[in-house]
Amino acid sequence: MKTLQNNFVEAIGNTPLFKLKAASEITGCNIYGKAEYLNPGGSVKDRAALALIRDAEEKKLISKGGTIVEGTAGNTGIGLCLLGNSIGYKTIIVMNDNQTQEKKDLLRNIGADLRLVPPKPYKDENNFVKYAGRLADELKSSNNHGVVWANQFDNTANSKGHYETTGPEIWEQTDGKIDGFVCSSGTGGAIAGVSYTHLTLPTVCRV
């Protein structure tokens, strides 16, 4: 395994599987956890952040010096900001003002321009996600290098990133011997992407 990486981007992914001993013994199955906390930003959301940025770059929506805007409760914002620092983008994170002080401090400490808004239901135009999209539109005319709204909740690049990385990694690490996949869901990117990977492979994997 390559352990020396040239930059933050290269350190994302290829996380190990480790056997969950107690769960395996109780069920009589081999149950493994994928150590996504070993991504450099500390969570699986680094994968989504990278996929969202690469998608914007491929579509020529942003170049070095540009700005990424996102509404997030934490981990995706951390990934976007750390990647932005590494690649050369400014990051504006829109977050509900009732989030923990630790999250706010962490995002500010890694360089995010943090915009706090009052909590609103999704149908409200000032919901943090919709606020982020509107802010990105407002800023586009002021930056020649591009301003993009990452939009992790609706951007299919999120699930595509997992289809191209997380799913194949699990397949290779288990030599294709996988009967089931369990995943919590926030945006749905990880579970959708990994599920689609296994639909395209010669296996019967319950999700």
Regions found by a protein language model. Give the residues of each.
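PLP-dependent amino-acid enzyme catalytic core
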Residues: M1-L199, R206
